[in-house]
Swiss-Prot record:
Keywords (A to Z) from UniProt: Chaperone, Cytoplasm, Protein transport, Translocation, Transport
Record-linked Pfam families: SecB (PF02556)
Disruption outcome: Growth continues, but export of its substrates is blocked. Expression of chaperones DnaK, GroEL/ES, ClpB, and HslU increases.
Record keyword Cytoplasm present: yes
Task performed by this protein: One of the proteins required for the normal export of some preproteins out of the cell cytoplasm. It is a molecular chaperone that binds to a subset of precursor proteins, maintaining them in a translocation-competent state. For 2 proteins (MBP, MalE and PhoA) the substrate is wrapped around the homotetramer, which prevents it from folding. It also specifically binds to its receptor SecA. Its substrates include DegP, FhuA, FkpA, GBP, LamB, MalE (MBP), OmpA, OmpF, OmpT, OmpX, OppA, PhoE, TolB, TolC, YbgF, YcgK, YgiW and YncE.
Cellular component aspect of the GO annotation: cytosol
A biological process term (GO) from this entry: maintenance of unfolded protein
Origin: domain of life: Bacteria
Name of the protein described by the UniProt record: Protein-export protein SecB
UniProt-listed CDD domains: Translocase_SecB
The family this protein is said to belong to: Belongs to the SecB family.
Molecular function terms, GO-annotated: preprotein binding; unfolded protein binding
Length: 155
């Protein structure tokens, strides 16, 4: 028991890498002749898996779609991966680490990759605002708690 109480939390980044990237401009070149007033949609998703004892892969998927009216100007997707050594935490703390802390580390890399691809597609510069993954994680926990409550009420 005393060994468990003395276990310190350890966190180390082993590797950050681009797992998958995609850029499509399905309506080029005529989309370049239109007034550039796009509607930009940002979708985020995270996934994690345990690779070994205390070693986890976290993948942040960022998808940006820019539309002009009904036409898609571009669609850009990045899957930014990271391998992390994490020990000394469990349960909700581990879920927060994998679902919020690690994505916070990965997002700047994904954002830079998206900015580069959009620029190479000769579209105007796209600056993605920082994302509060802690707030997104808390919303996720609240949704999960709400769904659990609804299930108990139905029973």
């Amino acid at each position: 028991m005393s060994e468990q109480n003395n276990t310190e939390m350890t966190f180390q980044i082993q590797r950050i890498y681009t797992k998958d990237i995609s850029f499509e401009a399905p309506n080029a070149p005529h989309v370049f002749q239109k007034d550039w007033q796009p509607e930009v949609k940002l979708d985020l998703d995270t996934a994690s898996s345990q690779l070994a004892d205390d070693v986890y892969e976290v993948v942040l998927r960022v998808t940006v779609t820019a539309s002009l009216g009904e036409e898609t100007a571009f669609l850009c997707e990045v899957q930014q991966g990271g391998i992390f050594s994490i020990a000394g935490i469990e349960g909700t703390q581990m879920a927060h680490c994998l679902g919020a802390y690690c994505p916070n580390i990965l997002f700047p890399y994904a954002r830079e990759c998206i900015t580069s691809m959009v620029s190479r597609g000769t579209f105007p510069q796209l600056n993605l605002a920082p994302v509060n993954f802690d707030a997104l994680f808390m919303n996720y926990l609240q949704q999960q708690a709400g769904e659990g409550t609804e299930e108990h009420q139905d029973a």
